[in-house]
Amino acid sequence: MVLASFLVSGLVLGLLAQKMRPVQSKGVDLGLCDETRFECKCGDPGYVFNIPVKQCTYFYRWRPYCKPCDDLEAKDICPKYKRCQECKAGLDSCVTCPPNKYGTWCSGECQCKNGGICDQRTGACACRDRYEGVHCEILKGCPLLPSDSQVQEVRNPPDNPQTIDYSCSPGFKLKGMARISCLPNGQWSNFPPKCIRECAMVSSPEHGKVNALSGDMIEGATLRFSCDSPYYLIGQETLTCQGNGQWNGQIPQCKNLVFCPDLDPVNHAEHKVKIGVEQKYGQFPQGTEVTYTCSGNYFLMGFDTLKCNPDGSWSGSQPSCVKVADREVDCDSKAVDFLDDVGEPVRIHCPAGCSLTAGTVWGTAIYHELSSVCRAAIHAGKLPNSGGAVHVVNNGPYSDFLGSDLNGIKSEELKSLARSFRFDYVRSSTAGKSGCPDGWFEVDENCVYVTSKQRAWERAQGVCTNMAARLAVLDKDVIPNSLTETLRGKGLTTTWIGLHRLDAEKPFIWELMDRSNVVLNDNLTFWASGEPGNETNCVYMDIQDQLQSVWKTKSCFQPSSFACMMDLSDRNKAKCDDPGSLENGHATLHGQSIDGFYAGSSIRYSCEVLHYLSGTETVTCTTNGTWSAPKPRCIKVITCQNPPVPSYGSVEIKPPSRTNSISRVGSPFLRLPRLPLPLARAAKPPPKPRSSQPSTVDLASKVKLPEGHYRVGSRAIYTCESRYYELLGSQGRRCDSNGNWSGRPASCIPVCGRSDSPRSPFIWNGNSTEIGQWPWQAGISRWLADHNMWFLQCGGSLLNEKWIVTAAHCVTYSATAEIIDPNQFKMYLGKYYRDDSRDDDYVQVREALEIHVNPNYDPGNLNFDIALIQLKTPVTLTTRVQPICLPTDITTREHLKEGTLAVVTGWGLNENNTYSETIQQAVLPVVAASTCEEGYKEADLPLTVTENMFCAGYKKGRYDACSGDSGGPLVFADDSRTERRWVLEGIVSWGSPSGCGKANQYGGFTKVNVFLSWIRQFI
């Protein structure tokens, strides 16, 4: 039996294996596998319990294994148990559900209301007493209604009343139904009533009547008032009884009224009118209050509230709204920092003493925007030197600023288009009994201005300064109640204070911001914005607490309302007159009030550069209103400025000699008077008594001179940098008492035409030279691009450190007047050998900066054959490099005579028809123009020697300038001086087409004297 079962089982397994080939089989319940269990969670968060799961047999590659039938997994079964409150293994449903849930798996939401109980299987609601309906939503009977605290009610029956009876406490009247009933539809027959307090009856006003418009004096009852003629009703015409038992207003009065005149509109201001009587009686009856508020960036000047007095007058003058600069103004401030839109005035306040300080002003009446604004106001006559407030007005573009000398200030003229400004007067404000300006409050001997405008700390300080005040500053760390009450009265809760905290981690160190009168003590120090820790935190006063005010700090850049303060005590001090400006001097003011010079203030004077002070340095305003000393003077120190230093020279300044006596160099003896000795002694003047005051000379000698200024008597000694220059003018000059240097200006000019070579050039039949024998000789090389080389093609003559003269045909393209690019030329000075490789360190090579050819140059006949080359960098004069002398009319007349000998030099072709390797020279006699023309005519080469040319050479030829010598010098010896000099009379220009050194065919030279005026245009 077992075997049969095994065989059957094997057969079945084999058949199943064949059927489920090739890889994996489907599960079959063969009864061979035990149950497994899934762990599921009951409820959320709930608990874990096990659920039995049946397993089936599966095959994989002919091998059986067990797993849950139908590939069932825990995720397929467990989720539905999470909604249960209690679960049971094997039960295909929840045992119990959470509150307000129902159904097999607790998926339904119970809808029961008013405490109804939900059936967990069906969701049906079991209602409590007094409720019915599917969801227990219907209340049996009528709902209870709320009632006022003063209403008394009786319910019948108490638990589920069908009627309610109402009544009121004593002193109240019932308004509404005394009984309401519950209707079949579940609604009450009426609203609950109210208990209303009765208002007291009012008697008629004096000179008037009152009428009640209803019987009961309860809420809504109205009284109407009227006055007998000629009285006006002041207050409400009707009063209504309110629910609280009070009338809705004050009982009116009957008065005989007066009216105030109409008010003009105030620019940039809004106003609110509070009228004590009805508008029908007139615009501004007595008791009317008009309150002004300035818009935008405008500040109120004057009283913010005007009241119509019983006598028909206003309590004060109308205020104005003006823009106030939010930067502090000093004597150096420029108007550009304060200008607003065109035509818009801005109030500033200038300190005292600005006429005593420096600062440029351009214009008269209308000024340039870069002018010193306070000095301009004094110049315009809008302010005295003692300072004060003024309105600066943007005048728009302007271009004709006129200079003038007005009110002790000299303005400059300027003819350029720029923004301009002018001034308007500031209306003077009246002061009350306290001495404070209109709209200011007296607080502990101070005048306080309060504004709700918001500004950063520094900007707020600027506004206060331009109101002739400062940010409110206290001399102790206790806030006075009077200030707190004033600020609260203006509706402020926080306000900047002119105190500053150095370090948030340390106790407060209070700092006074008044920079004109700094008092240093333990509790009060001066603030400097550059100190560490001062950059961000500023002090403000928090007055929100009704019981006390406290100091706090916040960022200085955060806007806040603020209060300005001025000291009343200054107004009781003696005041000194304005001392006026100090010519050529400055003044530093100490302790002055912002609007003048009071007792105790002082002025310290100083002079401008090159001036000294004569008189008392510091003057003080005394208690009797006078200055302690006269104003000093600034006296100019006479000096000479730096004398001009000549090019290629130097000047040495020597101080004045210590004695005032004059000694004559070379005097053999001193002359003495022919008197007896006693008489001679008596002839001396008695000694002068010494003064305790320093003399003018002593004061002037103590003044420190700026660089470039020298005292009277100083000496300037001139020298040239080398022997290659000679000094023209005065070698020594002295600073005289007029501030001028004596003598003639000195200059160093190159020594021209001097050769250091001892060799005589006039060696007949010779052509050799020495190195440096002709130091003005210049070699001119041109870049030959086709040959990739520099070629020495012409000569030239050095005129000074920067200029060389040569022939025009050397620097122009062949047969044209077109100038070759200067970059294609190099100039050599001090050169001896043609070959550049043989040049030594004394040869100076320069590039051309500019080339100038005579504008009349004719390349056809070489007339006007002259050109100038400017060097990029000047040469240094040495033994080998020196300039040649230019001719004069006298030298030209002497030298250009027939037969006069001259020397021509260059690197041109020699008799072997090769270019010379060294500088060659030739001595040539001058030939008459007619002889020259005749010689060429005989050779059938007719030409004309113009007045700009001359000829030189020999009848038989022998020596001549040749190709390569063009542009070089033809010089003549000038022995009219002690030392021989050489003069440039000619420039090698042209020769015979047949060749060099031909008989009767002389060399042509450009006559330099003709072109002296043209040359001097450049050098």
Curated annotation (Swiss-Prot):
GO cellular component labels: extracellular region
Activity regulation statement: Activated by Gram-negative bacterial lipopolysaccharides and chymotrypsin.
InterPro entries given in the database record: C-type_lectin-like, C-type_lectin-like/link_sf, CTDL_fold, EGF-like_dom, LCCL, LCCL_sf, LE_dom, Peptidase_S1_PA
GO terms assigned for molecular function: carbohydrate binding; serine-type endopeptidase activity
Signal sequence annotation: 1-25
The EGF-like domain, residue ranges: 102-137
Residue ranges of domain C-type lectin in the record: 436-568
Entry keyword Glycoprotein: yes
Enzyme class per UniProt: hydrolase
Disulfides per UniProt: 106-118, 112-125, 127-136, 142-182, 168-195, 199-241, 227-254, 260-308, 294-321, 331-350, 354-374, 436-447, 464-564, 538-556, 576-621, 607-634, 720-748, 794-810, 932-951, 962-996
This protein's record includes keyword Hydrolase: yes
Cellular compartment(s): Secreted
Swiss-Prot/TrEMBL GO biological process terms: cell adhesion; hemolymph coagulation; proteolysis
PROSITE patterns, per the entry: C_TYPE_LECTIN_2 (PS50041), EGF_1 (PS00022), EGF_3 (PS50026), LCCL (PS50820), SUSHI (PS50923), TRYPSIN_DOM (PS50240), TRYPSIN_HIS (PS00134), TRYPSIN_SER (PS00135)
Boundaries of every Sushi domain copy: 140-197, 198-256, 258-323, 574-636, 689-750
SMART domains per the UniProt record, alphabetical: CCP, CLECT, LCCL, Tryp_SPc
Catalysed reaction equations from the record: Selective cleavage of 103-Arg-|-Ser-104 and 124-Ile-|-Ile-125 bonds in Limulus clotting factor B to form activated factor B. Cleavage of -Pro-Arg-|-Xaa- bonds in synthetic substrates
Active site location: 809, 865, 966
Domain Peptidase S1: 763-1019
Keywords from the named record: Cell adhesion, Disulfide bond, EGF-like domain, Glycoprotein, Hemolymph clotting, Hydrolase, Lectin, Protease, Repeat, Secreted, Serine protease, Signal, Sushi
Ranges where the LCCL domain occurs: 325-421
Function recorded in the entry: This enzyme is closely associated with an endotoxin-sensitive hemolymph coagulation system which may play important roles in both hemostasis and host defense mechanisms. Its active form catalyzes the activation of factor B.
Summary of subunit composition and partner proteins: Heterodimer of a light chain and a heavy chain linked by a disulfide bond.
This protein's name: Limulus clotting factor C
Naturally occurring in which organism (per UniProt): Carcinoscorpius rotundicauda
